[in-house]
């Protein structure tokens, strides 16, 4: 009985460890900030990449958590917020993770980001992990606060 209980507990720990390691961060050179917040995740990055770049990459399936970070470069390439949002949904659908997260900018940053974030907050399938960012100046992402800027695309991607 004790041996069976030990095996069950060991199995739970292995399952939790595997789930933590079954996360993938994709994006540009800024992915290091997310890596700080999600230390067990694997990383794929290409400097200067946009969400459109990742749409053309062969997807990796069976991922529990997919974190997408391309917003800065999408803005540099003048991709409109609505297009960026719809492309992130396409990317989530193509890669089929259990949970899909995208890094979102703070509210009081560049005006394009403000407009973009406000548009996203109205989407029914977006859940913010933390919107209490009013005290941040928005000009710099501190590496230990990246986790505050995720939004999660849920269900209907």
Could you describe each region identified by the protein language model?
Residues 2-3, 17, 41, 64, ...:
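Generic cytosolic/nucleocytoplasmic N-terminal low-complexity/intrinsically disordered segments
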Residues 3-4, 79:
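Short coil/turn segments at secondary-structure boundaries
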Residues 4-15:
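Sec-dependent N-terminal signal peptides
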Residues 14, 29, 49-50, 119, ...:
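Secondary-structure junction/capping motif
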Residues 18-65:
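Serine-esterase "nucleophile elbow" of acetyl-processing enzymes
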Residues 55-157:
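Alpha-helical cap/lid subdomain in secreted, periplasmic
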